[in-house]
Regions:
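Single conserved hydrophobic/aromatic residue that forms the stacking wall/gate
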Residues: 1-12
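Radical SAM enzyme [4Fe-4S]-AdoMet core and its adjacent flexible, acidic
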Residues: 38, 59-63, 70, 75-198, ...
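Flexible mid-to-C-terminal extensions adjoining Fe-S/redox cofactors in radical SAM and related proteins
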Residues: 194-196, 213-270
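Structural motif corresponding to alpha-helix initiation and N-cap regions
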Residues: 25, 50-51, 74, 117-118, ...
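Distinct, well-ordered alpha-helical segments
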Residues: 28-31, 51-58, 117-121
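N-terminal active-site wall of soluble small-molecule enzyme domains
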Residues: 26-35, 184
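Active-site groove signature of glycoside hydrolases
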Residues: 13-21
């Protein structure tokens, strides 16, 4: 709570509860309600989104919930998640969130195993989902291993998927976003009417770990700590040397995720 309350007199206005898996916290509803003067969002796999929890989150004024679904195919989803049976839990969570009146979006990290994204969009449309986002895999944590990196889609492959996805969304009235800097060509995204993603670490967003430590973004899982939100001033965190270094990136550099290991293939105008 102290980390949240420090934002009241400082500069940030949006609060996202993410993880790990934030629905494991028994005090999640309390934290959301405590943060009601922020624009609040919950990022989750959806498995623990019971009807009661969704109702409580709605009553606590949660502004939106983003649920991750890897595929319309239960086998593919469970394989990528690494847990058999997780697909059905996630789908039930999506249904419960929609039924509770929550503002729901569904994110799909794309790779070679789930590149039939059009079928996932059709499936989500059938559930009543109106807002979707997709991304490449972020090379952090377990996804930084050789197998995960090799499953990344090329810029060309991602472009083909996005082109088809944009057509489907226009036909169904869904809205689509793309969140991976450098994973798709800028010109293509502009032509499709999809906002061009740029790295916002240490500028438009930072992350706070469960023990109150500030890090550049939610995917930056190790190596850099910008300060302790429980005791350090926001000014000292904002002016940390790493923050300044990241914010000093030029426009071309910000079209890439700093965590990306291979940057030879550009997603810019080339």
């Amino acid at each position: 709570d102290r980390s949240v309350s420090r934002g009241l007199g400082d500069v940030y206005k949006r609060q996202t509860f993410t993880g790990g898996e934030p629905t494991l916290r028994r005090d999640l509803v309390e934290l959301v309600e405590y943060s009601r003067w922020f624009v609040t969002r919950l990022n989750t796999n959806g498995i623990l989104l019971t009807p009661d929890l969704c109702r409580e989150l709605y009553e606590a004024s949660l502004d939106s919930v983003q649920i991750t679904l890897y595929s319309w195919d239960s086998g593919i989803h469970d394989s990528l998640v690494g847990r058999k049976g997780s697909f059905h839990g996630t789908i039930e969570g999506i249904r419960n969130a929609l039924n509770a009146g929550l503002n729901v979006s569904v994110n799909t990290p794309l790779c070679r195993d789930n590149q039939d994204y059009g079928k996932t969009l059709a499936f989500l449309n059938g559930l009543g989902v109106r807002y979707v986002t997709c991304s490449g895999l972020i090379e952090t944590g377990n996804a930084s291993s050789g197998g995960s990196v090799s499953s990344q889609l090329s810029v060309r492959e991602m472009g083909e998927i996005l082109t088809a996805a944009a057509d489907i969304c226009r036909e169904t009235g869904m809205e689509i976003g793309f969140t991976s800097p450098g994973r798709a060509e800028v010109k293509l995204l502009k032509r499709l009417g999809i906002p061009v993603p740029m790295c916002g670490a240490c500028l438009s967003n930072m992350a706070v770990t469960p023990d109150g430590l500030a890090v550049p973004c939610q995917s930056w899982l190790g190596g850099v700590v910008l300060g302790d939100m429980k005791k350090d001033s926001w000014k000292s965190i904002w002016n940390h040397a790493m923050c300044k270094k990241i914010r000093a990136m030029g426009e071309e550099e910000s079209l890439f995720c700093p965590l990306r290991t291979g940057k030879s293939e550009k997603g810019g105008d080339t």
